[in-house]
Amino acid sequence: MSEVETTNDQTPAPKRKDKKPSRSQLRSASRRLALQAVYQWQMNKTAVSEIETQFVIDQDRDMDSCDKVYFRELLQGVTASAKKLDTLFEELLDRPLSELDPIELAVMRIGSYELSQRLDVPYRVAINESVELAKGFGATESHKYVNGILDKLAQRVRREEIAARREANKESNK
């Protein structure tokens, strides 16, 4: 058996070994599932514990490819502090909160949660992951809107981190 397979264009591609997903891949998957769960909570007002159970039991959802602890933290943290999270970004919006698309709202709540509560997640990662969620699940241009709002929020809640990054960039460009 060969160690090299060919791709559709007949160029050799390294044979894939059963490689475990990286921590960032697991967290990205957790965010995708948390988005779906938060959206369900927003739309149906189903108890969070019931939603979590549905996600764990449902074989169609790939819970094995995510960080279950992080999924649970996002779901529980976002839903428990939704009103507080909304106040963080509401004044940055160009329209009332009630007029936001439900997917955009769920994405912004997750992004706001990570920016304000998960200081171990770099602000650029929190914003980028939210933008990717908006691209994958939101309306055509929603990712641009999400990016703008969360970037402004990061300027407020991660001021020191942003300043340190800018200073480090200045030093490396000398």
UniProtKB/Swiss-Prot annotation:
Statement: the UniProt record of this protein carries the keyword Transcription: yes
Family classification: Belongs to the NusB family.
Alphabetic keyword roster: RNA-binding, Transcription, Transcription antitermination, Transcription regulation
Protein name in the entry: Transcription antitermination protein NusB
Designated gene of the protein: nusB
SUPFAM superfamilies: NusB-like
Annotated Polar residues bias: 1-11
One Pfam family hit: NusB
Region described as Disordered: spans on this chain: 1-29
Gene3D superfamilies (UniProt xref): NusB-like (1.10.940.10)
An annotated GO cellular component: cytosol
Source organism phylogeny: Bacteria, Pseudomonadati, Pseudomonadota, Gammaproteobacteria, Oceanospirillales
GO molecular function term, any single one: RNA binding
Function: Involved in transcription antitermination. Required for transcription of ribosomal RNA (rRNA) genes. Binds specifically to the boxA antiterminator sequence of the ribosomal RNA (rrn) operons.
GO terms for biological process, alphabetical: DNA-templated transcription termination; transcription antitermination
Organism of provenance: Marinomonas sp. (strain MWYL1)
